[in-house]
Amino acid sequence: NEQYQRNVDAVVAQYDAAEGTLTEISDQVQNVHSLILKAVNGTNNDETSRNIFSETLQQTKDGVLKSLNAVNLDKYILGGVNNKTTPYTLDEAGNLFFNGVNVDDISFTDGVYLDENGNQVPLSKETYIDIGLGLRMHGDNFNKDTAFQMSFSGIAWTGYGISEINYTDKNGDEVTEEVSNNVYQIMSSMQEALEENDMNRLGALNDHMKKQYDTILKGIAELG
């Protein structure tokens, strides 16, 4: 019937938009990974080169932020269920926020994104649509395999929370540092490492970002 076809069309459009946007981000992250490999190889770490690398990182960050806030059919593609305000914003220090919460403070428990106080991140709830697969209920809940997801929180792929990285700093000291899992935030840390001419830290951050890049690729495969 017509409603069924409309639902199917809506699902296809939303998945295509999410896949396309995530592919844009993956390309940008891959470019950064290649850029940083050049920066840490020892022949491109003079101040002029480092400044160029940092400027390129800033341009890439701007592109990632634009992709995160991309719109399709009046809906933020990666904003969860936020259709009214820009989902991904920056504070004065340049930290990335998702629907008002610093991405570094977000955790994921029992299918829910939580802030540092254990409250659900605003507008991050998943929504689903029935396209005739026989929606099955389990009490008040439904089997997600019998419906299609219609809202996506981009942090599922671009990263949230923090992890530890280990490296030997430029003074020869072993360092354990807590860093963001979000690719945007990692790029900001990379800019700091470039400014400090700390190539070991930069390399460790690049390895860390590669893990999140793999998560982005998995997301593209799931959406495709």
For every predicted segment, state its role.
Residues 65-222:
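Polar, low-complexity export/assembly segments characteristic of proteins
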Residues 1-83, 192-224:
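Amphipathic alpha-helical polymerization modules
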